[in-house]
Amino acid sequence: MSDTEENVLDSPASGEAAGEVISIPGPTDEAEESDISPEQEYEIEGFTTESEETVEHYSDLSVSTPKSYDSKPRDEVVSLGSATDSHEQEYRLGDLGGDQRSEEDEMSFLYKIKAIKENLQSSVKECIATVKIVLIPAGQEIVMPFRVDAPFRFLKEHFAHLLRIPHHVLQMAYTGISVGNNESLIQYGVKPREIVQMNVFSSEPDQYPVRRIEGLSEGSKIITVTIQTGIERYEEVAVEIVKSDFHKPFLGGFRHKITGLEYHNAGTQTVPKKIPEKDNLFCRDTQTVFQKKKLQQTMNTTSTQMTKIGVYVSNMTDKLLTPGSYFSAAEYHARRLNAVIVIQTAYRRWHAKCYVDSLRLQKKMRLEWEKEEELKKIREKEEWIRMDYYRRHNPKTTEDFELLFNALELWRQEEVTQVEQYSSEAERKAALCELLEKETQIIASIGRHRYVAQLERQDVATQAFLDKCSASNTWRRPDGQTVEMDTQFTIRARELQSIYKCILLKNLSQDERLDILLTLKHTVKEHECKLTQEILELIDREVDLMMRGVKSHNLEGLRKRITTLFIHYIKTPLFNPEVAKHLKVPQDPLKFYDKIYFCHSCQMYLPSVEFSVSPTSHRVYRCRHCINLENETQRRESFLKYKCLLQRLYFSEANYEDNSHIAYLMQLQDIKYLTENIWASQSALSAWDDLNDLVMVRWNKHVEWSPWNCILLTKDEGTAHLKLESIEKGYGRLFIHKIKHKHILAKNYFSQVPVLASLILKDDEIEAIRSKYSTENPPKIIVPHGIVPN
């Protein structure tokens, strides 16, 4: 809508139109009555009655107010602005002394009333703000004018009526803060003629959800427009702008001769009203039926019109029909049968063509899928080779060094095989000595890499340990949020961590290094013991050497000793109480007795986490370090592939979500025994022996995984196996017998595990097999010489 079209709108009409779109009873009636006290209400009522009597008494003077004011109710004019006490006194004095004044005084009194009314209305008009209401979560926006001093409860009741929601459930928020029923916009600092946004939502969204208001025109917008109603007189009118795509017809208008602006009639500016559809109307004769029971014959069959004297019948439209060949009913049905055959032939041809096209499309999609799968496998293989190459050249973890020693053993076996082909004994010995020297050099190189990796892991472990000690104490509240608290111990640990990080900094100037050493000295000086004395002596020695001009690279050993001693200082609970929670060795020896085991290989007492216990083992014998050392010196096996196989088993069982727990009891040695000794490290179907492509899936997918309910297959074979509805229909009898035999071997081996033994004993099949091959006589016990049996 243009400005010219807006100025043409008449103020009363536009005000009524806006009131029809959004009718809020509060700001015009109830809101103002609630703001007026009972005493003021009594005074205003007296004022209105007295003013009405005065106007009726002097009606012959024909004094009239402008149309815009007369169109409004009198009580609205009085209630929009709260009159001051001085004005009310003038009204009372004017009414009491009206009979004694002259006619000129009475006219001046009416003019004063008129001026006061204009001031009151102008003040009320200026206190309106534009409010944009956003319905959450519907996302509908409604723009409307609202008084800044009116309470929010009228706005809430209005939208509660539109949304059909109880007003006590509906909530309103301004700038993220819920507003009260008796609060207003002016209390939140909103000034007149400002544009604000408020959110409307439901406190019980499940029972009373907020939906879109269907009755409002889409794209409609209500704005406040100031129009001129007289000389130096303006009025604000709420105007609704309707965005419509209909063609506005030109229904006439006029053009301003001076400005040249065109003003169209109101019919071209508003959406035409839809004409209601009328129901189908029928005459009375069409709704009644007259029944006749006698037979009648039409008149056309009783007479024939022909040419005769006095009558001429034209034969221009007549046709000469010649009789065709006669065909019998059998010929007619045969012709229809031939037509049906032709139609069926065409349909079958079309249907076969569609079927072939669908098969061709399926074949194309299948070939594309197979191609993508092949590319995926190639990428996975390349990624595995790339990671294997990276592991060999940059070993970091224990698995990486196992892989290196395994490759070394394979290389040594190949070289030994070639050496054994030599004819003479001297050549074989010389070749074996040369091979031993090369092997020694490779082992030394691996040892250097391991030393570097240990230093890196030690630094990372130290930083992680300090971060854990200096972390704040956290709790999770019932609402999901986290509460953090710092104690004096965590603050102390954080201070020591910051000093440790400063000590590790390099490329510092001499003054900066002296400041760090001074801070460290003041921190350590708080406690007196042998450790702190050593740290202080080393600090003094470094300061002395720095003053003598010794270069930094010559002080690296001294600085490393200071760092190591300071780490011992940090890990002492006397100096850092927070560290006592994270030490492997607890301060109370009584808590440590049940978790200490003796290693028969290295003759050391170690905590339980340093031992790897298999489910089939009955006692703790050797620690992890001794087992790894034996593997490096003798077998040199790599367990990385078995670890990946075990990880794939864990992930596949987690997807079932049936609370299976036997798979998670399997250790690395168990899965290795199950793969090598029972399944021969190859697929049961295709005999594929690459462990990177094999998975251990359930034999019966409806029963949880166990060593006696599994099968070793490739990834593709495992996916196809799990899609089988019945194992008996999918495999042959001999293959099923072979798999069950392997399951019996697994049961015999894992029956040593107490947890698994209880599950195995419940199996009727294994009991039947054991009873079939059991013997009544006990086995013979062979007693060595020198031992007396009990």
UniProtKB/Swiss-Prot annotation:
UniProt keyword list: Cell projection, Cilium, Cilium biogenesis/degradation, Cytoplasm, Cytoskeleton, Flagellum
One BP annotation, GO: flagellated sperm motility
One GO cellular component, as annotated: 9+2 motile cilium
Domain IQ: 336-365
Matching Gene3D superfamilies: Phosphatidylinositol 3-kinase Catalytic Subunit, Chain A, domain 1
Gene it is expressed from: Iqub
Organism the protein comes from: Rattus norvegicus (Rat)
Biological role: Adapter protein that anchors the radial spoke 1 (RS1) complex to the A microtubule of outer doublet microtubules in axonemes. The triple radial spokes (RS1, RS2 and RS3) are required to modulate beating of the sperm flagellum. May play a role in inhibiting signaling via MAPK1/ERK2 and MAPK3/ERK1. Additionally, may play a role in the functioning of cilia. Not required for the functioning of tracheal or ependymal cilia.
Superkingdom of the organism of origin: Eukaryota
Protein name: IQ motif and ubiquitin-like domain-containing protein
Basic and acidic residues composition-biased segments: 85-100
Keyword Cytoplasm in record: yes
Compartment list: Cytoplasm, Cytoskeleton, Flagellum axoneme; Cell projection, Cilium
InterPro entries: IQUB, Ubiquitin-like_domsf
Amino acid composition bias (Acidic residues), ranges on this chain: 29-44
Oligomeric form and interacting partners: Component of the axonemal radial spoke 1 (RS1) complex, at least composed of spoke head proteins RSPH1, RSPH3, RSPH9 and the cilia-specific component RSPH4A or sperm-specific component RSPH6A, spoke stalk proteins RSPH14, DNAJB13, DYDC1, ROPN1L and NME5, and the anchor protein IQUB. Does not appear to be part of radial spoke complexes 2 or 3 (RS2 or RS3). Interacts with CALM1. Interacts with DNAJB13. Interacts with DYNLL2. Interacts with NME5. Interacts with RSPH3. Interacts with RSPH9. Interacts with ZMYND10.
Location of the Ubiquitin-like domain: 129-205
Region of interest called Disordered, as start-end residue ranges on this chain: 1-100
